Amino acid sequence: MAREKFERNKPHVNIGTIGHVDHGKTTLTAAITNVLAKKGQAEVQNYADIDGAPEERERGITINTAHVEYETETRHYAHVDCPGHADYVKNMITGAAQMDGAILVCAATDGPMAQTKEHILLAKQVGVPALVVALNKCDMVDDEEIIELVEMEIRELLSSYDFPGDDIPVVQVSGLKAIEGEAEWEAKIEELMAAVDSSIPEPEREVDKPFLMAVEDVFSITGRGTVATGRIERGIVKVGEEIEIVGIKDTRKTTVTGVEMFRKLLDEGMAGDNVGLLLRGIQKEDIERGMVLVKPGSITPHTKFEGQVYVLKKEEGGRHTPFFAGYRPQFYIRTTDVTGQITAFTAEDGSNVEMVMPGDNIQMTGELICPVAIEQGMRFAIREGGRTIGAGVVSKIIE
């Protein structure tokens, strides 16, 4: 019986709950599954199931994340919830759990707190496109005016981080009362999910985006030419199409004369495929790991960018000691290490930071020694002698 309802005939959207510790993110997640389960659109997950999330490792970083899934009338959702603040930081920066949108949970009893702000900033930096606010614990506040003040405060806060604070839906909920089955609060969860359905845009499918493949390896095939292999990150490439080779050296154009997968010839390769592309008029020495093959004009190489970085703790295999501006690590971007320099560290309020400790979450400005294809929202690792010491996401391209 329960098996039938998860047919994949609805658009799939990835979301998560974010917000300050103890504001009720996990309880709200449980409440959503409880309310939707009554309509046969979810399996009930209780607080303990979600809170006891197993550890996962993403690029060597340990993250606790709970994954639940449910449906509304129009969509299928995968929802992530993390037990601890550090897990959110790591999750959002590494992109371990991609979010097309998020439910910002804020307790009406407390209003916005330190991590409320930090999570909004993180959402902005890592490119979470849309938020919906769940004003939680509203059953505990008798005075409607207090709730209105908290709502105003949240809207101003969102606007200060360049989210559309005036337009974002704010829904008054009580996760606990909804789980206990009180009808008015169950209705509020449905209202929240209706807001999520309408305010969080459906993500563009990878296959509809402009073609990009990072080069992993290059071969010469006698009598046929040069083949670049890799996994197509997005888009579609067809035999006979013109593409650009971008990064490290000057950008140049070529034509794809063959697409091969598992030794078979194809007419086209699409997002997710591991392929070899035969390139016209290209010598083996013209192309190397770390370059990308792209739809012409869709991406340009850059050397200078801002990033949001999580610095690994020593228990995670990171550094044991702090480092300072001027530090020269390797930036691992897509398929290769590029030497660069971290020229500045910036705190949340925009002030300069001298020293960065293992375990910190920080904004940095980086400069690479050669131009590579980087873009906003792209993930990278910071490495030193082959081991990862930081994980980051590009928040802004400078030049």
Swiss-Prot record:
Positions that bind GTP: 19-26, 81-85, 136-139
GO terms of molecular function: GTP binding; GTPase activity; translation elongation factor activity
Entry EC no(s): 3.6.5.3
Spans annotated as G3: 81-84
Region (G2): 60-64
Lineage: Bacteria, Bacillati, Cyanobacteriota, Cyanophyceae, Synechococcales
GO cellular component terms, A-Z: cytosol
Region (G5): 174-176
Catalytic activity as recorded in UniProt: GTP + H2O = GDP + phosphate + H(+)
Top enzyme class: hydrolase
Localization per record: Cytoplasm
Region (G1): 19-26
Keywords attached to this entry: Cytoplasm, Elongation factor, GTP-binding, Hydrolase, Magnesium, Metal-binding, Nucleotide-binding, Protein biosynthesis
Residue ranges annotated for the tr-type G domain, each copy included: 10-204
A Pfam family the protein falls into: GTP_EFTU
CDD domains: EF_Tu, EFTU_II, EFTU_III
Protein name (record): Elongation factor Tu
General function of this protein: GTP hydrolase that promotes the GTP-dependent binding of aminoacyl-tRNA to the A-site of ribosomes during protein biosynthesis.
